[in-house]
């Protein structure tokens, strides 16, 4: 009998410049959406434990980019950043973690909608970016720390226009933070088999996140933030990072609320598999144990290629052992130390019982019809034939449950509605609610973008511009129309309110009650938002009987 692990690592297998000036200039449209900027050696100066940083002011928001929060040697845990003299210029994004060729460039249409900014890579990438309404003013504002997506293999704190924190900081009087950390082989290659020196190598990317939170705890007051009111939120791989930090002992007390967007990670790598990937990587590099330190000097490109080869090898071995191979990739490992246990299996982490959570997904996530144009006009009969490939003799059960959950569905919904992220999100919410501690709130983002004839629907990442109140800034994805702007105002208010109080209820939205397994209250975000109760309970029961592998 095959052994299947419930894990949000499935999404890891699917996913993966600034302008400045001297004094009151207009930033070119190519760099941003416009607005007055003030930048000089005496403006926007804040003091950190490492030294002073100089940012700039845009539309009343103080902005700092590329501020070092730590430093690290390859495969080693992070340590305090070097101190500096004078004022460090912090007006441009710092380096991003080196990573493989972007997996997301499927088409010109996708490039247009997402409008990625990959920045420039360097292993010295441990940087934070900060947007705040005030510095050195004695105020204590809620802090919202965004963890980027891309699984644990790719991404950065600047990669999407949606990530810009100006509008969210200004609207909510909050401090917004994004950051970069080590990814892929640099952050999660487990070399613990080669001695104590490399004992934590498989989790240094996770330790980077902890180091960033520790830095914020010590320094955010200088940027007008309240270290005792920190919310971590992230999407896709970023949601997985949030899930994992909730179970990381060294992160306890460094944040107080958590939001998981399309990235509920219940399980992550087990040490026996991460070590196999590590040893297979070393073998692929042609190194022996006695020469392991040479791995420090091997080029990144060679290292990554060996790591990817090792992952493929271990996946193939796992298939023969009856283990679902899609769970293997770059990710934190349960090492008994940095991460003592699985994040949400068999239960929610006790250390985070009193941390309120929001959990949700988009209705379509990795929309099949986006990438297979013929599916956009698919008939019900054709859709059913695709369903039979997965659900076989239970296809009729699936159809009946689907019609109950989504009575106004179109034929393409049968293959577009997400069943990769939603089941894990519901399970995570149930586990959190079962703790009977702080509440958990559930949402489903169902708004569909009109861009490019609606080809993206409510795809993966679609909710991010709404959360950051960047619907106009990221109009290539949202269209930037009146309906999108109205929903963006409501959703960003909900996220701000949650960061401030742990309760997301906001004007313009129906009363939002906490999720329980019995009622399954879920906020459907759309032009007309509504609360639904266990709408897809029967449908998920059918879906869970089958491996999450798509069609």
Region spans (language model):
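Mobile gating loops/cap/lid regions near enzyme active sites that modulate substrate access
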Residues: 67, 423-551
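Non-catalytic accessory segments of hydrolases
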Residues: 20-203, 227, 326, 477-491, ...
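Alpha/beta-hydrolase active-site loop
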Residues: 125, 199-221
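Substrate-access "cap/lid" subdomains that shape
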Residues: 114, 218, 252, 261-382, ...
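Alpha/beta-hydrolase fold nucleophile elbow
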Residues: 223-235
């Amino acid at each position: 009998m095959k052994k299947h692990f419930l894990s949000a690592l499935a999404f890891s297998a699917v996913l993966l410049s600034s302008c400045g000036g001297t004094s009151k200039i207009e930033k070119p449209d190519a760099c941003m959406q416009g607005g007055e900027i003030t930048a000089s050696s005496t403006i926007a100066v804040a003091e950190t434990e490492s030294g002073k940083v100089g940012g700039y002011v845009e539309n009343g928001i103080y902005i700092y980019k590329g501020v070092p929060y730590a430093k690290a040697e390859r495969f080693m845990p992070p340590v305090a950043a070097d101190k500096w003299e004078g004022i460090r210029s912090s007006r441009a994004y710092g380096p991003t973690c080196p990573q493989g060729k972007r997996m997301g460039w499927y088409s010109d249409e996708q490039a247009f909608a997402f409008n990625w900014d990959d920045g420039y890579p360097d292993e010295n990438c441990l940087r934070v970016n900060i947007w705040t309404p005030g510095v050195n003013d004695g105020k204590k504002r809620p802090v919202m720390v965004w963890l980027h997506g891309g699984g644990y293999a790719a991404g950065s704190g600047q990669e999407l226009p949606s990530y810009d924190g100006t509008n969210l900081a200004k609207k909510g009087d909050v401090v917004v933070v994004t950051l970069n950390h080590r990814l892929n082989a640099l952050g999660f290659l487990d070399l613990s088999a080669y001695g104590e020196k490399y004992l934590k190598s498989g989790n240094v990317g996770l330790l980077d996140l902890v180091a960033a939170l520790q830095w914020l705890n010590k320094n955010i007051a200088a940027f007008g933030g309240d270290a005792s009111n920190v919310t971590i939120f992230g999407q896709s791989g970023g949601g997985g990072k949030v899930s994992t930090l909730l179970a990381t002992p060294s992160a306890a007390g460094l944040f107080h609320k958590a939001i998981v967007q399309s990235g509920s990670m219940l399980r992550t790598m087990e040490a026996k598999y991460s070590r196999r990937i590590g040893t297979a990587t070393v073998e692929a590099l042609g190194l022996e144990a006695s020469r392991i330190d040479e791995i420090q000097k091997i080029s990144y490109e060679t290292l990554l290629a060996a790591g990817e080869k090792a992952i493929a090898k271990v996946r193939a071995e796992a298939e023969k052992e009856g283990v679902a191979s899609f769970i293997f990739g770059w990710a934190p490992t349960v090492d008994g130390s940095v991460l003592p246990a699985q994040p949400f299996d068999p239960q929610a982490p006790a250390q985070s019982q009193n941390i309120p959570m929001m959990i949700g997904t988009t209705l379509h996530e990795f929309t099949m019809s986006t990438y297979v144009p013929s599916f956009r006009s698919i008939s019900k009969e054709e859709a059913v034939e695709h369903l039979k490939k997965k659900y076989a003799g239970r296809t009729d059960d699936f159809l009946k449950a689907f019609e109950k959950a989504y009575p106004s569905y179109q034929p393409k919904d049968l293959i577009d509605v997400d069943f990769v992220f939603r089941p894990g999100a519901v399970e995570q919410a149930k586990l959190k609610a079962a703790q009977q501690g702080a509440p958990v709130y559930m949402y489903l983002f169902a708004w569909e973008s009109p861009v490019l004839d609606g080809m993206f629907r409510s795809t993966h990442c679609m909710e991010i511009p709404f959360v950051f109140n960047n619907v106009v800034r990221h109009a290539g994805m949202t269209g930037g129309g009146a309906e999108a702007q109205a929903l963006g105002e409501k959703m960003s208010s909900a996220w701000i309110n949650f960061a401030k109080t742990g309760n997301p209820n906001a004007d313009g939205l129906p009363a939002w009650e906490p999720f329980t397994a019995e009622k399954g209250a879920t906020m459907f975000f759309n032009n007309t938002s509504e609360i639904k109760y266990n709408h897809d309970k029967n449908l998920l029961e059918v879906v869970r009987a089958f491996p999450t592998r798509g069609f």
